[in-house]
Amino acid sequence: MYNCAIILAAGKGKRMKSSMPKVVHKVCGKEMINHVIDNVRKANIKDVNLVIGKGSETVKEHTKDRNVTYSMQEEQLGTGHAVICAEEFLKDKKGTVAIFTGDAPLITNETIQELFEFHNSGKYAATLISSTVQDPTGYGRIIREASGVVKKIVEHKDCNEEELKVNEINSGMYCFDIEVLLNSLENLNNDNSQGEYYLTDVIEIIKKSGEKVGAIVVPYEEIMGVNSRVQLSEAEIVMRKRINHKHMVNGVTFIDCESTYIDVDVEIGNDTIIYPGCVIQGNTTIKEECTLYSNSRICNSVIGSGVIVENSVILESHVGEGTTVGPFAYIRPETKIGKSARIGDFVEIKKSTIGDNTKVSHLTYIGDAEVGSKCNFGCGTVVVNYDGQKKQKTIIGNNAFIGCNTNLISPVKVNDNTYIAAGSTITKEVPEGSLAIARSKQINKEGWLDKKGLLKK
């Protein structure tokens, strides 16, 4: 059986009060439209078409790696009109098409699979997703026949007294037999107060033709649409609970899961402990037995097993197993730190490689450098990598000891097994086995304070 999907993503999203299309706003690190696309794909649906309109180029930019096709809806004349705009996508296809909304990011791949299976096994012409809620005010009601088969969808404003008591609501997401849908769209009109073409009217057209219409009922959170910043926040809360629950089931300890913020594509190994206030973003991978103390942020990075991070920021970097980072360290993009290293407090590292067992314990800046293994950096060391026009490279070999308050003026090379005396400013290569001293000779002027009248008696 051929299955495909159309995702409606042309809405303006006026209530978002944003210059961006509504569907590219993110929930737990991923655009709403990409949540829907990815879950459709997890349900083994290969052909996906997006109906786009306002901000179409922005939507295309955010979905360019998703291997989807696009249909344009120049004017927003209702959900039925949006599907009419995708008729070219459906042309000459036979099978089943599902229609989803790009602003409902909480729909799961399990529900999508269930929708297709229910629709195809029951040989329905149309199947819709519904939900039951305590307060259905404002929603279209699902009216069923005594047998349980869907009879019609009635908008709230058109409900009679009995229909208002129904608490099963329409989600705006459907499955259709493609041929039946295309035939029904030919009979769709905009004879209503809004002058729009409603997809809900297609259900009534199908019923009148004698075809079967079914429905599956899912939890409300799965069909919740996002039309405002308030609803965006509500969706974020639901998604975050799902993400954290998944990690806890897989063996991750959260000291306080409600104050831990993890993006949807993050991977975390078992026996890792995460303290409150941590933010883990993007395509980050954290391996087994790590400890992330409070107020740490890690984005698009790989953290090896047994790493300890405390009150630190790690961006687009790799940290080797057994390394400790922080407190208050700043690991900037394109940094690779080896195994069992020590990156201490108020250390900033940018676009550099740090070898195994190297210690950079405090108050140090390293930029555009290659540092070997078993090195030790004293407090206050600075790699001076910028000459006013471009960044220069520093190379430090294995077993180098860098004394406190050393300036390494790039480009410069410090070879294996070297010592640099505290307070030195190094501008030339330091040979292997050498001690480098580059500082002014100390001069003591005896009696100077007395001569200047500054000596307190």
Curated annotation (Swiss-Prot):
It is found in: Cytoplasm. Acetyl-CoA binds at residues 385-386, 422, 439. This is Bifunctional protein GlmU. Residues 1-229 are annotated as: Pyrophosphorylase. GO terms for molecular function: glucosamine-1-phosphate N-acetyltransferase activity; magnesium ion binding; UDP-N-acetylglucosamine diphosphorylase activity. Homotrimer. GO terms for cellular component: cytoplasm; membrane.
